[in-house]
Amino acid sequence: MKILVTGASGFVGQHLVKLLKQQGVCVVGVGRKLITSDADMFFSVPDFADINAWQKPLEGCDALVHLAARVHVMQDKTVNPLAEFRKVNVDATLNLAKNAAQAGVKRFVFISSIKVNGERTEIAKPFTEDAVVNPQDAYAVSKNEAEQCLLQIAQQTGMEVVIIRPPLIYGAGVKANFASMMRAVKYGLPLPLGNIQNKRSFLYVGNLVSLIAKCIEHPKAANQVFLVSDGYDVSTTELLQACAKASGVKARLFSVPLKLIEMTAAILGKRVAVQRLCGNLQVDISKARNLLGWEPPISVEDGLKATVLRFVGDKDLQEINS
């Protein structure tokens, strides 16, 4: 089997390429810049909307995993964020899908986002695949539009489409907010998060690529949407404590009423960030379990341990070399 992976040099892409190679798959990697990759072949495509860029990379491919995207940012400085997200996440995705269908690709696996469902849930009322979508920012809107257009292409061309909506992904090499959290824990910064009673679904990158691999080949995955997580939800407090344990340090957490945290965040212009940190977001992965027979192969504890150990090791190396 020959699989094309866009975003092959990214955080998830590197893990996926490694897994597929272990499974004996021929992997064609694609990225916007030419880099060294574990893929059997790697192509640089600076503009994914270029209709002439895909003939060679798609040649002979049985399936395609589309990871590349314009990712969500907390404070987008562009004049028209939705237009920029649509350019990459909708228009370029559809160009790729049409080229893939013309090239004879049988299945297109699209990595979307749980943000298509919405930003928060009530405890014990997780998101499901058949819930009404509720995208609330430009990134989520663009992902939802891409999903709908891909399903239309599937009907028109016969190319199968699989959509996966992950929540926050962590793992070795993770950056952004998760890395900031690990940094705060490692260096013993006091955090007012000692009694946050929320529940959130997270996703270890190893579990995500496991589901992607399953969706590439399972007959029942065709033209389906799947939500995915580690299968065990934790509070923000529990997450920080687990990271501290894996780092070999004690979490310096103290309790502050959530209302006070929210009021302070509003004054500092951090309301949205705190809502995401302290709010609930749970997903139900029953469909992937029941339809595909898939189970997350890696526990939350083991996933966090691998993530933190890599983070601590990288920081130690930086300190040695500085």
List the predicted regions and their residue ranges.
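N-terminal Rossmann NAD(P)H-binding glycine-rich loop of SDR-like oxidoreductase domains
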Residues: 3-23
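NAD(P)H-binding glycine-rich loop region in Rossmannoid oxidoreductase-like domains
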Residues: 45-91, 95, 99-102, 119
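Conserved Rossmann-fold NAD(P)-dependent oxidoreductase catalytic core, especially the SDR/UDP-sugar
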Residues: 94-138
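Substrate-positioning beta->alpha
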Residues: 95, 145, 174-180, 194-217, ...
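Active-site Tyr-X1-5-Lys
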Residues: 134-162
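Glycine-rich Rossmann NAD(P)(H)-binding loop
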Residues: 171, 193-198, 226-233, 244-248, ...
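Conserved C-terminal active-site "lid" loop/helix of NAD(P)H-dependent oxidoreductases
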Residues: 205, 238, 264-295, 306
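Mid/C-terminal beta-alpha module of Rossmann-like enzyme folds, strongest
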Residues: 214, 218-272, 305-308, 318-322
